[in-house]
């Protein structure tokens, strides 16, 4: 199963147009200089006097205690996914309502999540030549407030263009301090020095993913934070190079997520390849409301083996 070039180009064009023109007063122009300077994190050092922070629905571990149900997208264009349709508050209400399809007797409790594209790959190089645009702090804060009110996670998805995942992850320090905020890494949009998003399918070496999880694990431990979800999207075998070298980290619940759209049979086959030999890592499965041919029902998704621990809809 392979993502169609026309769809990838359409999404790149939609995101790129917003990077140039913005969304007026509702969202604003995406800042070329990113999220600003790193925050003062001294307040997270003294954790002895207060109880440790908890996850939105209690506890400090996400997987395997919960099944995560997520909606993906960004407010810049509806082509980027369902999460960006309507206000963040409306998106949170829709997420909570649709998550109920995955709950039931004998199943894990469901923890909803908003997967916001925090770094959007662009068809143009931008001022720094990195072919990506970071969301403004204003946009991220709006989704964080909505996620918090709905007792949901906020996952910041990174489409890095020609930048690297660690640099982009560190730009989100001020949000990762929050107990409900995690990361998603999208190797499809990790470009080499001469590659352009939308023209080729990207890839990443396991060492780069390991660098992100090592940094984030230290961050979690320093702040006595609950576990962080880190989702790694994949739909081709070559998207994660030297995949067997991926490392497990304290405080990190890493998910290997089967991405890509198509028929149920093709998606099931992709899922099998992605999770085969997964070792200590968790399982994820992504669906597309528009691009999938015959959208799988929640019952069909739950019949996959192993059962996905994270289910994402775009």
Protein language model features and the residues they cover:
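Surface-exposed substrate-engagement region within the catalytic domains
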Residues: 199-313
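Glycine-rich tight-turn/loop motif centered on a GG-T
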Residues: 84-85, 125-133, 197-206
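Active-site-proximal loop/turn and secondary-structure-junction residues that shape catalytic pockets
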Residues: 75-77, 118-120, 160-162, 187-191, ...
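Substrate-binding cleft of extracellular glycoside hydrolase catalytic domains
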Residues: 101-102, 109-189
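C-terminal region of N-terminal signal peptides and the immediate post-cleavage residues
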Residues: 24-45
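Structural preference for beta-strand elements that scaffold enzyme active sites
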Residues: 66-70, 109-115, 151-155, 180-184, ...
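N-terminal export and membrane-targeting signals
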Residues: 1-19
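N-terminal module-boundary/linker segments of secreted carbohydrate-active enzymes
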Residues: 38-89
């Amino acid at each position: 199963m392979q993502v169609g070039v026309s769809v990838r180009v359409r999404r790149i064009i939609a995101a790129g147009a917003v990077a140039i023109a913005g969304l007026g007063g509702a969202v604003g122009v995406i800042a070329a200089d990113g999220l600003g300077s790193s925050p003062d994190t001294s307040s997270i050092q003294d954790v002895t006097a207060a109880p440790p922070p908890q996850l939105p629905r209690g506890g400090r571990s996400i997987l395997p205690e919960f099944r995560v149900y997520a909606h993906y997208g960004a407010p810049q264009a509806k082509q980027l996914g369902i999460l960006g349709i309507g206000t963040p508050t409306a998106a949170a209400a829709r997420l909570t309502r649709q998550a109920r399809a995955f709950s039931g007797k004998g199943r894990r409790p469901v923890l909803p999540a908003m997967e916001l594209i925090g770094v959007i790959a662009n068809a143009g190089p931008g001022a720094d030549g990195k072919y990506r645009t970071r969301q403004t702090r204003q946009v991220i804060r709006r989704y964080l407030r909505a996620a918090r009110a709905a007792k949901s996670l906020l996952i910041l998805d990174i489409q890095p263009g020609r930048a690297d995942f660690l640099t982009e992850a560190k730009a989100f320090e001020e949000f990762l301090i929050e107990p409900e905020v995690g990361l998603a890494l999208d190797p499809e949009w990790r470009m080499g020095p001469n590659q352009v998003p939308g023209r080729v399918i990207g890839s990443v070496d396991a060492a780069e993913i390991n660098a992100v999880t090592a940094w984030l694990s230290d961050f979690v431990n320093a702040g006595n934070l609950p576990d962080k979800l880190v989702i790694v999207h994949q739909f081709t075998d070559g998207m994660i190079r030297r995949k067997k070298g991926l490392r497990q980290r304290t405080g990190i619940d890493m998910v290997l997520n089967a991405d890509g759209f198509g028929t149920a049979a093709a998606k099931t086959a992709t899922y099998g390849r992605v999770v085969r030999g997964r070792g200590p890592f968790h399982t994820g499965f992504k669906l597309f409301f528009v691009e999938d041919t015959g959208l799988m029902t929640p019952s069909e998704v739950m019949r996959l083996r192993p059962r996905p621990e994270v289910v994402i809809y775009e």
